[in-house]
């Protein structure tokens, strides 16, 4: 972390805010083995960039969403305010949901998928035992109150996908 901080300091970056989280991938990984160590941490820091792989990669490898393959994805928007361009970005790691609850474009799709899976005698997720992580980042010059209002939209997005969220207590 020291090397990263020193490098960023030279680039006039005044803050480094690493995000560490967990989404259970015990379906494919023995989590008690602690296979991620210092070497993997430094490799991840070296790979950090504005362009990055999404889907079934890295932290998204072992995720399951609605009983189907989950992953990691992002979306961002830019806006111009007082002649300056700012970005709002969201990173989501999906690892939740029972297949029967899946909707596509607002229409129930999970039961049809389950029927097909049952015909092929494959496994599926009958119940939701997962989690979801959402990270929102921005360089907008906002107050704490404004930032909290923006962040609350992450919970709304999660709720629209029939999952639960617990916002921090104020």
Model-predicted segments: where are they?
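Alpha/propeptide regions of enzymes that mature by internal proteolysis
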Residues: 1-170
